[in-house]
Structure formats: structure tokens, C-alpha cells
């Protein structure tokens, strides 16, 4: 029986309308953003960029023009008068990153904007009015001083070794005697802060502001507090935790100083007058509050007997407090924070609490998570209750803490009286599944606890499910692991005495993560951390911010600087990172040529193919030379790829004079590399590791005509020597899944994913993992480096999930999914995949089910985009004309259907 693909648009149910012109009401503009933020405060760029999405009830929606208006008040904007910018009618399909081109914007002022669009289906109405607020645009805009308590005032406090310090409480009363038009707080509380106005939290942000290299850059936050002020006396209060400013370990980790506050409250009255409340010596401070210690590695200690009832309200008596000290300035440039702070984003309900014979209780959250434990318990006066955290249990049900190294990860709460209390820490987080609770004299219930999941405030953008439960569980583990390690920087791990922004973990990982989360603002900020950590010679620290200062002059770890910038352009259409960081990237490229280029290859390498599966399961790193890839192979292949990236970046930045030098060096390196490392008789690179061959193949160094032979070596090595299992470390895994699939072995790629024996992701899951381990052998390896919550071994797996299994991929000749390539590989062994990705243009969906040679595939293409849909001819396809279908063509192996926006369904008949 002949099979036919039936293509149905989402509007077929409205077939009677197909001949009618849609009214303008059907064209909707939403998801309006300034610099990828919704109605943001604290924009400090001179030409903010606007973006939006469009939707309509009919398929094939294309924007043909837009008009943007900006004014200093919402009333003026609605009336269309006193406009600061009117773009006029611009004929364009661009709906992302359109720069403001009006009158000069003023520091600290609010602005209002709206947009309307023209489309091929009619013109829309003006959008709802949106707003943004400008930040400080000059250092002279700041009038306050850095203040705090410039002493170790409490017993046991220390600024060396395992540091210990109490939180600082600061307060400032002030008067409001007139009607308030607008009030905005500009604040930087280092290391972390909580802010209050008249007893109420100003925001839900936690661990604010973002961590940075404080001697280079200090971030501040901006909050509109207009509705929180009251006539008469008001009280501004701030609590300061240590964060990364007062470091957890000294020496060993970079430390900057004692916690410090810079704040400026600007109050504008309806009569046009202004007041300022600034941080200075008129503030009061104390460290004699209930948070007697806070250290991100070691935990928080809270003594309820020292609570300062009402300290952040007007009526509190602060006569026992000290006058605030003027603190040493951090030294870094004050910068409006470009990305949101961390926030509580999810809650985990414990699955079990078990009493031990020693009187302690073990709480099982059921999920390795990062954040803090909230409790509602009954305590006894002056009897501390201790909460100790771990990812894993020992066989005897005690906590396994060996992999935490020196981190104590312990919170202590001391009740003020007998009775019930509720509490969670403020300035620490833990990576944990299990909690040991001691100090209770009764059996608690699971309902007495809640796990609060804390990570950078960002939206979840990706959903994925398939017919294979293990494939789904790996995705779930990845989801939990990734958000666990978003801590204002992408960290390596959330639990031990490290928690650093290692560059090597994210070179490719950031691209896969971008399918699950809208991580653009976080990674833009991290690129600034990397630049701030670059030294005068041009070398890049492999940890950024450089809390560990490691200038290894390695290639593979710093490559993340380039790959992440490229990801932001490809995934989100934002080229600003490439333009901003191009000079620093060029400096690093030149530096590496000077220190590491020898006879046409890069000879420096520090980390190798980090964490490839060792031959003995107690090892962290393989000791077998046959498993190790030559460091010069790793460095040269990656540097060659970066030269090609720099050609692209130079063209984008208008630095075309740089291009010939990059191209010349790339050609010379390719020739020298192959002369030194490629065996033409065997088509092997170096000692024939999978990593050596797949990097050479995917990064374009294999001589023409040898590609298939090199790939055959990859397959033989994988199947014959490793039984169809992973044999790569951090570098090889970045290319493994896509490389196997691109050259026709999607079956082997799926086998690697669905393996349940060592080494594999399935092995981790069978051993109880609910996140991704640092090591393939995380259940048996030396605890010195054995995190149970890392993401570096994901490599290109998530990219493969969304692009190859689901078929959601940005076309090579487009950015930001303006043109979508939908070509699932339909591997045998998977009968169903359903996935979606919330792109900057809107949601893309792919939902396919296969039964033998019958296919049912539903796709959704968002407004103002197009898609190329590729269907294997094995399903016996034919397509007739239909609204939204632009073109149908055939190749030898597939039907190619080019469509506009809409919902379509392909079903074998």
C-alpha cells in the first residue's frame, strides 16, 4: 500500500476563513524585552536593544516592518508626543536586538517604549507599553561610601585558614515628607546581601550581587521601591554575608576584604525635588546578630537567642549598635549587573526520614539538589540542632563525606526557647540529597522539611521525552545537574571546597545547556568574568572569576571563551559578546602563538582529555598510555578551530584586515599537524584514540579523501576495544555523539547513550545517580576528586538530543532559529520523541512516533521564522500544496519540505 505524508496546518479547523484577510487583531506582539529582560531596571548601555515575538491565527506569518517609539513618560508615549525616538516605519523582518537610536539617555531615568508591526497578514496594533530604567552611567553618579564593620568582633572569628565571620546588619532611618513619584535603590552588598525597607524584603533575590573579580568589577543591583515607602519615617536595612568577597579559604582562594555595602536610594517627589539616602557613617552596624557564622563551604550557624526583633523597622532601638566604618573600596569598576540574581526556583519534598540508633535522623530528599533545607521543627532552649549534608550514603546509612574534602557543609540552629520554629539559611547553599539531623528528641516527619532549589533566575526553555526510559532519565539528570551549577557563574560542582568557574567544563556544554535554559545573560556575564581575569600578557585564567589563579597557557580550557561567545550568537542571535570580546580574544591568540606554537603545532597542554574512563575503577585518571591522547593533538586541533572562529568573528566585527593572517596560520598548522601526527597508511592520528581521531575529523584537519577511513577507526576503536562504550574524556565527548551520527552511525551513538554498564551515563543511573557524575567511575574512584554533581561529561549529548533525535536545529546559514533545520535521524530503538524548545522567536516543537515504517510527526514553527523539514523517503512520502508550504523537493534519500510558521502534521497512510 502506498504511504502518503498528510500535511495539515494548525488552521485547517478554520478552513472557512482561509480566503479572508485576517484583521489586525489577529496579529499579536508579545514577549517584549530590553536587552533580553522584561521591564528591567539598571540598564547601563547607551543604546539598549529591543526584541519581541509575533503570533497570529494563520500559518506562514512573516513580519514585514516595525515601528518603535520611546518616551520619558507612559502618558507621552500613549499620546505620541515628546518622543525621544520614533523609528518610523522600517521595512524589515528583524524582531531581535534592534538598537535604540534616539536622543541621549540619561542616568537613573525611566523610559517607556512600544512597538507595532506590519506582517504579510496585516498590521498589528501598538503593543502594551513597556518600561526600563537606566543605571548609573558614570562613577561620579555614586555619592555613597563603602561601609561595614572593619573588625573581627566575635570570639572564634578568623580571616585565615577555614575562615569564620558573622553577618553584618546595617540600618539607616530617613524621612519622606512629600508625595513620592519614584524611588529607586542602587545597591551592592559584598559578598552577599539581603535588603529590607520598613521591615519587608525588597526582592526575592538571594546571594546578591553576582560574584566577580572584585578588584576588576563590582556588580550592583537596581530596585524600584516606590510602593514600599511611607510618609514620615522609613528604615532601610541590609544584612551582609561573606559570599566570595570574604573568601572561604585563605590562602588558597582569592579574598578581597570584609563584607561591605554601597547603597544609594534616590527619591523623586511629584513636585520635582529629589532626596538621596546614601551609605555613609550616619548608618549603624552590628555583627551581634543571629547569623553568627556563614561560609559557603562550611555552612551557616544561626543563634535565635541573638535575634534582633524588628531591627529593620523604624521603631527598633539601635543605641547599642556601632557607627558604620568606612571600608576599603574593592577597586573594581561599578557595573550594573547584567543578569538576574539567584532565586528559589523549585521545591523538593523529602521522600523519607529514618531514625538511626545513635539518635540521629537521615533525611532523603530523593534527588541530588542544590540550595538549602527549610525546616519547621520543635526545639529546646539552648540545645543546638545540626544539619549536615551529603550527596551519598555509606552502606551503614551514615553520610559519605569523603568527596567533600575540607568543606564542613553543616548548618546549626540554636533555638531561643522551647517550642516550634521555622528556619532556613540565608548566605550558604549546599549540594545534597541526604541530610543528617541531630539534636532532636523526637521523630520528625517528612512534612517538617522542604528542599529549596536555588539557582540563577532564568526560564526553562527545553522539554524532551522519548520512548526509552533511560534516555529520558539521562535528560532529567542533566537538567538537575545543570541548574545545580548555575551560581552566578557556571561552576564545576556545588558541594565540595571548590565550586569554581572552570572554563573547560563549558566549551561545548554551554550550547547543550542553552536548549534547556535561557542562559544567555548568565553566559554573557561569565564572558566578562573571563576577560576581567585575563592578565597583561594576554593569558586567560582557566578558572573565572579567578578565585583560583591558574594561568596554564593551555588551549583547550580557554577555548570556552570563544565557543560560548559563538553560542550566544548562534543560539540567541546576540553578536554583542563577539564584538565586545574580540580584542581580548585576539590578544590571547597572539599570546598562545608566542608561547606555545612550535614547528606549526601548539605544544602546550595541561589537562589532557580530562577524566577519560580509566582502566581500573579506583583510579581518577587513566595510567595507560594507549588511552591517553597526545596533548599537542588536543591543543592543535582546538587552536586550529579557533583560528577559523576568529575569521568569522573578524568578519562580523569589521576587522577584515585580520583575516588573512588567521587563514594563513590555519593552513600552515593543518599541513604541519598532518605531517607530524597523521599516518596515511592506517588513517590514524597519534596513538589512534577516539579523541585524537574525532577532534581531527570534526574540526576539519583530516586530508580530503581520508574522512571515512578516519571515521572507520573511530568506530573500530569504540566497538572493538571498548565494547561500544564511551572511551573519551571531556574533550572527546564534546564531539562524540554528533560525529558518530554525521557519518552514519546513529545506531552506535544510541547504543552509547543506552548502555547501562561502565562506562556510561546509564551506569551512573543504575548506581543511584540523579545528576551527572564528575567521573565515569564515580562510585569507586578516589574521593579526592569525585563529585556526584558535575556536568562536564555531558559533552555534546544534549545538542544531540535536541538537534538529532528531535530535529530542532538552527540552520547553518541562520542565527537564533530564524531558519530551522528539522531532520531527526530516527534511530532504530527509539519509536517516539517529543521535544520543544522556546527559542527567541517562540516555541519550536517536534513530536514524532514511528511504528515500523509508519510515521506520525507533528511540528510547530514559530512566527517570523521558516523551517526546512526533511523526511526520509523510506516512509514513502508525497506532499501536496498547502497554506504555509513554500516548496517541496526531493533528493535521493529524502523529501524536503520548506514551510513558514504554523503547525503541521505528517502521517504515513
Locations of the language-model features?
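C-terminal capping/lid segments that line or modulate ligand- or cofactor-binding pockets
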Residues: 236, 302, 497-498, 516, ...
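Positively charged n-region of N-terminal signal peptides that target proteins for export
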Residues: 1-4
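Alpha-helical support elements that line or immediately flank enzyme active sites
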Residues: 183-187, 197, 372-391, 427, ...
Amino acid at each position: 500500500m502506498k504511504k502518503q505524508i498528510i500535511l495539515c496546518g494548525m488552521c485547517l479547523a478554520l478552513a472557512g476563513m482561509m480566503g479572508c484577510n485576517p484583521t489586525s487583531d489577529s496579529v499579536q506582539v508579545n514577549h517584549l524585552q530590553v536587552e533580553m529582560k522584561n521591564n528591567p531596571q539598571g540598564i547601563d548601555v547607551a543604546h539598549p536593544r529591543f526584541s519581541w515575538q509575533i503570533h497570529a491565527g494563520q500559518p506562514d506569518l512573516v513580519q514585514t516592518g516595525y515601528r518603535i517609539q520611546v518616551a520619558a513618560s507612559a502618558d507621552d508615549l500613549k499620546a505620541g508626543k515628546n518622543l525621544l525616538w520614533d523609528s518610523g516605519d522600517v521595512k524589515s523582518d528583524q524582531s531581535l536586538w534592534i538598537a535604540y537610536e534616539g536622543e541621549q539617555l540619561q542616568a537613573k531615568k525611566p523610559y517607556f517604549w512600544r512597538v507595532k508591526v506590519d506582517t504579510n497578514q496585516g498590521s498589528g496594533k501598538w503593543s502594551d507599553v513597556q518600561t526600563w530604567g537606566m543605571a548609573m552611567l558614570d562613577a561620579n553618579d555614586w555619592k555613597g561610601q563603602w561601609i561595614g564593620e572593619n573588625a573581627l568582633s566575635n570570639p572564634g572569628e578568623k580571616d585565615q585558614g577555614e575562615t569564620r565571620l558573622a553577618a553584618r546588619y546595617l540600618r539607616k532611618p530617613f524621612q519622606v515628607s512629600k508625595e513620592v513619584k519614584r524611588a529607586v535603590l542602587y545597591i551592592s552588598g559584598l559578598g552577599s546581601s539581603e535588603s529590607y525597607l520598613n521591615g519587608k524584603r525588597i526582592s526575592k533575590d538571594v546571594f546578591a550581587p553576582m560574584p566577580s573579580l572584585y578588584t576588576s568589577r563590582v556588580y550592583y543591583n537596581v530596585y524600584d521601591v516606590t510602593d514600599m515607602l511611607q510618609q514620615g519615617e522609613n528604615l532601610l536595612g541590609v544584612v551582609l554575608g561573606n559570599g566570595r568577597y570574604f573568601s572561604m579559604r585563605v590562602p588558597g582562594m582569592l579574598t578581597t576584604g570584609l563584607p561591605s555595602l554601597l547603597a544609594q536610594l534616590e527619591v523623586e517627589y511629584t513636585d520635582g525635588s529629589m532626596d538621596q539616602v546614601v551609605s555613609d557613617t550616619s548608618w549603624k552596624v552590628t555583627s551581634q546578630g543571629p547569623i553568627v557564622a556563614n561560609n559557603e563551604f562550611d555552612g551557616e550557624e544561626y543563634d535565635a537567642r541573638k535575634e534582633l526583633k524588628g531591627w529593620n523597622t523604624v521603631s527598633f532601638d539601635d543605641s547599642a549598635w556601632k557607627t558604620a566604618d568606612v571600608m576599603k573600596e574593592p577597586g573594581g569598576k561599578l557595573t550594573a549587573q547584567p543578569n538576574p540574581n539567584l532565586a528559589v526556583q523549585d521545591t523538593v519534598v523529602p521522600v523519607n526520614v529514618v531514625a538511626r540508633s545513635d539518635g540521629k535522623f537521615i533525611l532523603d530528599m530523593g534527588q541530588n539538589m542544590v540550595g538549602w533545607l527549610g525546616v519547621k521543627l520543635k526545639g529546646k532552649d539552648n540545645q543546638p540542632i545540626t544539619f549536615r549534608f551529603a550527596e551519598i550514603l555509606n552502606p551503614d546509612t551514615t553520610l559519605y563525606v569523603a568527596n567533600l574534602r575540607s568543606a564542613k557543609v553543616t548548618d546549626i540552629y540554636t533555638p531561643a526557647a522551647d517550642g516550634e520554629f521555622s528556619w532556613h539559611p540565608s548566605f550558604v547553599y549546599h549540594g545534597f540529597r541526604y541530610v543528617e539531623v541531630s539534636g532532636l528528641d523526637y521523630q520528625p516527619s517528612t512534612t517538617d522539611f522542604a528542599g529549596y532549589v536555588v539557582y540563577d533566575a532564568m526560564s526553562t526553555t527545553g522539554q524532551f521525552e522519548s520512548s526509552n526510559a533511560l534516555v529520558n532519565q539521562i535528560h532529567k539528570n542533566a537538567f538537575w545537574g545543570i541548574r545545580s551549577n548555575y551560581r552566578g557563574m557556571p561552576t564545576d560542582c556545588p558541594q565540595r571546597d571548590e565550586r569554581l568557574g572552570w572554563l573547560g567544563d563549558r566549551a561545548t556544554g554551554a550550547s547543550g545547556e542553552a536548549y534547556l535554559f535561557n542562559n544567555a545573560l548568565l553566559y554573557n556575564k561569565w564572558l566578562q568574568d573571563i576577560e576581567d581575569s585575563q592578565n597583561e600578557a594576554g593569558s586567560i585564567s582557566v578558572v573565572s572569576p579567578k578565585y583560583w589563579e591558574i594561568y596554564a597557557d593551555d588551549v583547550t580550557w580557554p577555548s570556552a571563551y570563544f565557543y560560548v561567545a559563538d553560542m550566544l550568537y548562534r543560539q540567541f542571535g546576540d553578536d554583542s559578546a563577539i564584538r565586545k570580546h574580540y580584542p581580548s580574544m585576539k590578544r590571547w591568540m597572539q599570546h598562545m602563538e608566542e608561547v606555545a606554537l612550535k614547528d606549526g603545532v601548539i605544544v602546550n597542554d595541561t589537562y589532557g582529555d580530562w577524566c577519560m574512563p580509566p582502566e581500573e575503577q579506583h583510579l581518577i585518571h587513566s595510567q595507560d598510555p594507549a588511552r591517553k591522547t597526545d596533548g599537542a593533538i588536543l591543543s592543535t586541533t582546538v587552536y586550529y578551530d579557533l583560528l577559523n572562529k576568529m575569521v568569522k568573528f573578524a568578519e562580523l566585527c569589521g576587522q577584515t584586515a585580520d583575516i588573512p593572517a588567521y587563514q594563513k596560520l590555519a593552513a600552515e598548522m593543518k599541513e604541519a599537524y598532518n605531517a607530524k601526527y597523521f599516518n596515511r597508511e592506517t588513517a590514524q592520528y597519534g596513538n589512534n584514540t577516539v579523541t585524537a581521531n574525532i577532534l581531527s575529523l570534526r574540526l576539519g584537519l583530516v586530508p580530503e579523501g581520508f574522512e571515512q577511513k578516519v571515521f572507520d577507526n573511530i568506530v573500530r576503536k569504540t566497538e572493538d576495544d571498548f565494547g561500544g562504550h564511551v572511551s573519551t574524556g571531556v574533550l572527546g565527548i564534546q564531539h562524540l555523539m554528533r560525529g558518530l551520527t554525521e557519518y552514519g552511525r546513529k545506531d552506535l551513538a544510541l547504543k552509547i547513550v543506552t548502555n547501562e554498564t561502565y562506562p556510561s551515563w546509564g551506569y551512573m543511573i543504575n548506581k543511584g545517580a540523579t545528576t551527572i557524575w564528575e567521573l565515569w567511575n564515580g562510585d569507586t574512584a578516589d574521593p579526592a576528586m569525585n563529585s556526584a554533581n558535575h556536568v562536564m561529561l555531558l559533552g555534546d549529548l544534549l545538542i544531540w538530543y535536541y538537534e538529532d533525535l528531535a530535529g530542532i536545529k538552527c540552520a547553518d546559514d541562520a542565527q537564533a532559529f530564524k531558519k530551522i533545520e528539522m531532520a531527526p535521524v530516527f534511530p532504530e530503538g527509539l519509536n517516539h520523541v517529543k521535544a520543544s524548545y522556546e527559542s527567541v522567536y517562540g516555541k519550536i516543537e517536534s513530536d514524532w512516533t514511528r511504528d515500523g515504517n509508519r510515521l506520525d510527526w507533528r511540528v510547530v514553527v514559530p512566527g517570523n521564522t521558516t523551517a526546512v523539514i526533511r523526511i526520509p523517503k523510506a516512509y514513502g512520502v508525497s506532499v501536496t500544496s498547502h497554506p504555509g508550504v513554500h516548496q517541496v523537493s526531493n533528493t535521493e534519500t529524502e523529501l524536503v519540505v520548506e514551510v513558514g510558521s504554523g503547525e503541521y502534521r505528517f502521517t504515513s497512510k
